[in-house]
Amino acid sequence: MHQLVAICVVTTVMLLNSTPTAQAQQLGAGGPWQTYDTSNGEWRSYAGDIGGKKYSPLDQIDASNFTDLEIAWEWTSVDNRVSMSTPGGGEWSAPLDTIVDTLIEENPNLHRPGHRPSGSRLQATPLMVGGVLYFNTPLSQGVAVDATTGETLWVFNPKSYEEGTTPMTGTFRQRGVAYWTDGEGDERIFWGTGNGYMVCVAADTGQPCADFGPDGSGMVDTMVGVPRLDRNDRDYLNAMLWGVHSPPIVVRDRVIHGSHVADRRITKEAVPGWVRAWDVRTGEHAWDFHTVPNSADEFGVDTWLNESWRYSGNANVWSMLAGDNELGHVYLPTGTTTNDFQGADRPGDNLFSETLIAVDVETGQRVWHFQAVHHGLWDYDFPTHPNLVDVTVDGRDIKAITQVSKQGFIYAFDRVTGDPIWPIEERPVDTETNMP
């Protein structure tokens, strides 16, 4: 029996401020858009706001009182006890290990060997809205917790563990959820699941949004329509090929997400890591941004020689996104294409891998892009979301965006035009290897 307990700790010194959700709305181009502003002490997005600032004005905890902090409450993960569907539409609840053992008895090949469902990798950053914490668990359960008492207010379980092991290098882990409100009482929580669904529930009850998605379940299948992807396919380690592990982002009225696509494939053919957008109210598919081209007339297809775009994959956003409601842009930091360290099957620069892309949130069209590595062979994925900042350079005010990288550089651009704020020197890589 493996009892896994995740603990969330808060402190008695911290005061949790909240204001009515309607007060968080600000007017943007074309209508009222939520801003995820942290000025009222709340934390409405993974990074505080959709611009990725990660700044809170709360000042109740500082160097003078840090040593006085005490544990106010502890929270035990709801992943310790889960449920499974039974014949006839029933539901059976039991400890996690009991449920998993039963699933394996029914289908011995359900999970990747050595990677049975586990709740031990709690990586989510909670949101805090109106005195309630919202987050998801390693098993893709959505949770609301009273920030004052630690009481679990609701749980929504999409039961992703019933389908198999989530994609390799990211098995059974989740990083957070997204919050949206129309400012008039409709408040929703969104998150992706390890088996590739986008979930929408009511923030106050945790009940699925019946108007989101095609069947009243409050979920849409993010695998549908992606090339070279079938929900029943597994990789050579018996893991799923596609999941959503990082939190989506809501920009204007679009809920947008990247994906976790299985790394280090041993086959030439792989799933492209497209970025997908859905209507925040209905779940209707809005657009896809093709990080790997899907036709011979798309922008960037000339960077995939020998028509290698027809079978290459990944170039996914496995990390987080950033957005600008006023401009109507969402910013995509992409990763490496397949295979990470071997590029013989994909000659060319391989756009849009390892690229920062500004996309029009209404249309899904590219506004500008910067590719940090051409024909990547070193796994130089952009490892996190960019940061939207306003700077003054030589007396000129600039709406800027900065992106940290595995290369050790911080790239800085005008986020409207994509022009570098400071010159970027590009150097060729020596291709002589002295190998026969």
Across the structure, where does each feature detected by a protein language model lie?
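Phosphate/diphosphate-binding loops
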Residues: H385-N434
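Bacterial N-terminal signal peptides
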Residues: V5-N17
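Extracytoplasmic beta-rich repeat domains
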Residues: W75-T125, V155-G183, D211-P247, H290-M320, ...
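Blade/loop signatures of beta-propeller domains
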Residues: Q26-T76, N80-E105, T291-E298
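Beta-propeller blade signature
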Residues: V201, G206, V271-E284, D349-G364, ...
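Boundary at the C-terminal end of the N-terminal hydrophobic targeting segment
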Residues: A22-A24
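Repeat-blade elements of multi-bladed beta-propeller folds
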Residues: W43-A47, S118-Q141, M168-Y197, N238-T267, ...
